[in-house]
């Protein structure tokens, strides 16, 4: 090509293993990228049976109808960068190599899956699942300057895209087509990024900004800072989960040290179709006490602008929400279970069905609980204490009506003793707020 790209079809002689209506192209992709970091993928169908690994400077351009498909039964992920590092047991050294300037534009990136898997069953880092927190189709970790644009992800069994330890990124014009878990899953030590125009159907969080995360869902823990999310459309359909997660926390390493996984300077605007923005700590389900002493995290300077949310039903279809439990059945468009300092709402339109769900709110602040008594199992973290301060708002609409005072639609949650527990139950506090 004129720009010096290699055409992957020039390596078709390597793709000799037949599969379905085509052939396995994994080796052809790898050889082409070794010869030239700039690769062109024309319209066609390319089956992949092992991970494609990108080095610094990799630049892939695919036609919009080019289909790159990870075949059924492959345990490992479809594509990743070379210098991935696992930070789940300790901080990644500053001297660890970072890949630089990786770009992928165009194409349909798919898996031959029809259900949620991940967590070692699919989307693994390698056959040994040596980085257990990897559960995805695309993985980028330890990268400076990442660009993903005009991509469609189809039928991904784990996350569609998982990134962490990234400095400087643009992720634009991404479609999720029948994806069974999270769409864009961002983990810690990720800074200076722009996310624009994400849409589609996912069956878990459309976007997860998880500075803190579970050990089976992240290898990178730390701050998320200086991000803009502009343009999100959450599609409906059976099993659609129309939510965005924003999760800080205090992550404990094995040696007893901790990581402050805070979120700071986050601007979210032009979102349509979301039901809930989850800003609470959630650790893995547990009996008696959480498996790790994770601390409540902090969010500083977050804004929501031009948001249209439909929260007429709870996004978490748990019995206490559906049955309107007067203590634990509260749910909201904005659910806060972190320490928040500086939060602004501007032109936010929310639908609530207070007649069916009197415990539905614009915002709740405090802990959540779903306790399964017969199993002694807690799904959330009812021991959380948190404070929200510095809230400002303008042009808030509830069910189409402009609301001058949002206090009737905001609730501080205080559980008291809701069941026998060795841990004290928590409460949320709102202070220092103004219009």
Regions found by a protein language model. Give the residues of each.
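Extracellular/periplasmic carbohydrate-active domains that bind, remodel
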Residues: 1-435
């Amino acid at each position: 090509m004129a720009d010096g790209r290699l055409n992957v079809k020039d390596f078709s002689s390597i793709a000799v293993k037949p599969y379905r209506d085509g052939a396995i192209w994994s080796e052809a992709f790898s050889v082409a990228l070794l010869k030239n970091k700039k690769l062109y993928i024309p319209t066609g169908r390319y089956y992949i049976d092992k991970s494609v690994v990108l080095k610094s400077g990799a630049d892939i351009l695919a036609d919009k109808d080019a289909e790159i498909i990870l075949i059924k039964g492959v345990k490992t992920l479809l594509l990743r960068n070379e210098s991935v590092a696992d930070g789940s047991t300790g901080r990644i050294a500053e001297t660890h190599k970072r890949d630089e300037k990786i770009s992928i534009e165009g194409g349909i990136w798919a898996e031959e899956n029809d259900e949620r898997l991940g967590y070692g069953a699919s989307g693994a880092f390698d056959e040994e699942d040596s980085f257990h927190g990897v559960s995805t189709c695309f993985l980028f970790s330890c990268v400076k300057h990442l660009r993903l644009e005009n991509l469609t992800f189809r039928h991904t069994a784990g996350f569609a895209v998982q990134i962490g330890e990234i400095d400087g990124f643009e992720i634009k014009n991404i479609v999720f087509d029948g994806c069974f878990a999270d769409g864009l899953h961002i983990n810690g030590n990720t800074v200076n990024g722009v996310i624009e125009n994400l849409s589609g159907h996912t069956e878990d969080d459309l976007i997860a900004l998880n500075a803190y995360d579970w050990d089976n869902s992240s290898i990178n823990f730390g701050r998320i800072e200086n991000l803009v999310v502009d343009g999100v459309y959450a599609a409906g359909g059976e099993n659609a989960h129309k939510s965005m997660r924003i999760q800080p926390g205090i992550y404990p390493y094995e040696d007893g040290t901790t990581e402050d996984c805070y979120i700071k300077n986050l601007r979210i605007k032009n979102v349509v179709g979301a039901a809930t923005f989850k800003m609470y700590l959630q650790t893995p389900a547990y009996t008696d006490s959480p498996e790790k002493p994770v601390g409540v995290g902090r969010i500083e300077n977050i804004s929501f602008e031009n948001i249209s949310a439909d929260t007429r039903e709870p996004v978490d279809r748990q019995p206490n929400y559906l049955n309107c439990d007067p203590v634990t059945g509260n749910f909201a468009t904005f659910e806060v279970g972190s320490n928040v300092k500086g939060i602004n709402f501007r032109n936010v339109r929310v639908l609530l069905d207070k007649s069916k769900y009197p415990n539905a709110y614009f915002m709740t602040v405090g802990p959540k609980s779903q306790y399964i008594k017969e199993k002694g199992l807690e799904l959330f973290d009812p021991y959380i204490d948190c404070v929200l301060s510095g809230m400002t708002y303008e042009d808030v609409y509830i069910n189409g009506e402009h609301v001058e005072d949002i206090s009737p639609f905001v609730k501080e949650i205080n559980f008291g003793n809701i069941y026998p527990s060795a841990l004290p139950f928590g409460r949320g506090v709102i202070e220092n707020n103004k219009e």
